[in-house]
Amino acid sequence: MSAIKVFILSDSIGETAHNVALAAAAQFSDYDIRYQRFPFVRTDSLLQTVLSQALKEHAAIFHTFVDRRLSQIVNQFCEAHELPYYDVITPALDTFSQITHVQPSNHPGTVHALNTNYFDRINAIEFAVTYDDGKNPSGFLEADVVLLGVSRTSKTPLSLYLANRNLKVANLPLVPQAQIPDEIWKVDPKKIFGLTNDPEKLNDIRRQRMVQYGLNPDTMYSNTDKIKAELEYADKIFKKIGCLVINVANKSIEETATLITESLNTDDTNNG
């Protein structure tokens, strides 16, 4: 089967439409879906050029135009030429108009404006990089979230994902022979999250990691008995701290992050 082509059109950067398309496409993993992004489409002439190309290549269209007129042009073109399309933003704008009884401002890219929220996110990302992998124990006392876990339990990618939600995250790998920094015991246990995994899953992940490095996959690093010992050690630490433990086996980064933020929000509500 030939690849499915999806055009992402927007009068801003198109990130929202792209993310929606990716989320939906994840349910169709057997298909080869290829995306082409067309950001900052704000003139009729440029829009018509892109639409003509979409028609020529039989591409589906996902779009976010806060300019209602451009949005209508796309929708009408797709309907007239029987091109599959999805208008990502218009229904949401209509819903908020109904709620507020106010028309949208129609300013493309407002969500990406350089506001306080943007700089907080940049600071959170810098924090995650600085305090990744237990580099500096002082970060544990400043963090909104502290992640603990043995090697290959998604600590670093999860830290960066949460940083994009403006949370300052520090993480620490748990190794049986290594001493736990004193700072960990001073952190509120509600801010600490223990990450674990199934031994078989972790064995597979570590073996793949060694293969990627061009090394023998059958080492002590991927040894099942050693992995079980590491997980047992980590579990003892989690119980001693009294933190929430999350098994990341078969969970996406997004799912794990949601469990963490929900736990934080619940604690905030209870303390409010």
Swiss-Prot record:
Q: Which Pfam family, an example, fits this chain?
A: Kinase-PPPase
Listed EC numbers = 2.7.11.32, 2.7.4.27
Which GO molecular function annotations are given, in alphabetical order?
Answer: ADP binding; ATP binding; phosphotransferase activity, phosphate group as acceptor; protein serine/threonine kinase activity
Tell me what reaction this enzyme catalyses: N(tele)-phospho-L-histidyl/L-threonyl-[pyruvate, phosphate dikinase] + ADP = N(tele)-phospho-L-histidyl/O-phospho-L-threonyl-[pyruvate, phosphate dikinase] + AMP + H(+); N(tele)-phospho-L-histidyl/O-phospho-L-threonyl-[pyruvate, phosphate dikinase] + phosphate + H(+) = N(tele)-phospho-L-histidyl/L-threonyl-[pyruvate, phosphate dikinase] + diphosphate
Q: Which UniProt keywords apply?
A: Kinase, Nucleotide-binding, Serine/threonine-protein kinase, Transferase
**Signal peptide feature range:** none
Q: Which superkingdom does the taxonomy of this entry point to?
A: Bacteria
Q: Which residues bind ADP?
A: 149-156
Q: Which InterPro entries match?
A: Kinase-pyrophosphorylase (IPR005177), PPDK_reg (IPR026565)
Q: Which family does it belong to?
A: Belongs to the pyruvate, phosphate/water dikinase regulatory protein family. PDRP subfamily.
Role: Bifunctional serine/threonine kinase and phosphorylase involved in the regulation of the pyruvate, phosphate dikinase (PPDK) by catalyzing its phosphorylation/dephosphorylation.
State the name under which the record lists this protein: Putative pyruvate, phosphate dikinase regulatory protein
Which organism is this protein's natural source? Lactiplantibacillus plantarum (strain ATCC BAA-793 / NCIMB 8826 / WCFS1) (Lactobacillus plantarum)
